[in-house]
Amino acid sequence: MPPELTPTRRSILQATLRLGAGATAGQVAQEVGITKQAISQQVNILRKLGYLQPAETRYGPLQVTDRARAALGEGLPIYGQIAAGIPALAEQSPEDFTPSIEALLGLKAGDFLLRVRGESMTGIGVMDGDYVVVRPAPEVHDGEVAVVLVPGDNAATLKRLYHFGQDILLTSENPAMPRLSFPAEQVQVQGRMVGRVGVGAPRVSHRVTE
């Protein structure tokens, strides 16, 4: 917890979140159990520190910032960029905060995660044990990475999909894995891959060679 975020200030932010949109300083003071004078002082400090939005009006509702959500464990700090080529000095102060992991990944309603088993998609950085973000869709465009159900498999598979006449070709991103072809009516598309969450140690990637 940041040193300036004392237990009292943390309680104020948590109470503001609990009370929701429209929460006033008076309501938060009552929720936390402090005086109106004390809440006024703490609110001013929290605004200066960037944990509460600036006041639109003197008695307007309190609004927590993304920085506050991150400090309360509801978001992740973004510490700038890191170089993959020439070494760069790591930044010590966060330049921004993401309000949640959903916002960081750009998730939409209905999106879900699947854990990957196997190494057929390592060429695009999807490793065994990683998670892929899937956006439900009954169809995908040629070349998109899709989650599909195929004949003889009880589980869905992750492959790059192409249409060829009445057939569907499913290709891996690993030259050691064979391509698969099925009649289009036997393939059921569950959705398209829109993101990846890597959770394992770095490994060697493979790329498809034509």
Curated annotation (Swiss-Prot):
Site-annotated residues for Cleavage: A84, G85
Database matches in NCBIfam families: lexA (TIGR00498)
Protein family (similarity comment): Belongs to the peptidase S24 family.
Entries under CDD domains matching the protein: HTH_ARSR, S24_LexA-like
Record key words, sorted: Autocatalytic cleavage, DNA damage, DNA repair, DNA replication, DNA-binding, Hydrolase, Repressor, SOS response, Transcription, Transcription regulation
Signal sequence residues: none
Any one Pfam family match given in the protein's UniProt record, by short name: Peptidase_S24
A biological process from GO: DNA replication
Entry EC number(s): 3.4.21.88
UniProt name for this protein: LexA repressor
Residue ranges of the annotated DNA-binding region, renumbered to this chain: 25-44
InterPro entries, A to Z: ArsR-like_HTH, LexA, LexA-like, LexA/Signal_pep-like_sf, LexA_repressor, Peptidase_S24_LexA, Peptidase_S24_S26A/B/C, WH-like_DNA-bd_sf
Organism: Deinococcus radiodurans (strain ATCC 13939 / DSM 20539 / JCM 16871 / CCUG 27074 / LMG 4051 / NBRC 15346 / NCIMB 9279 / VKM B-1422 / R1)
Enzyme active site: S120, K159
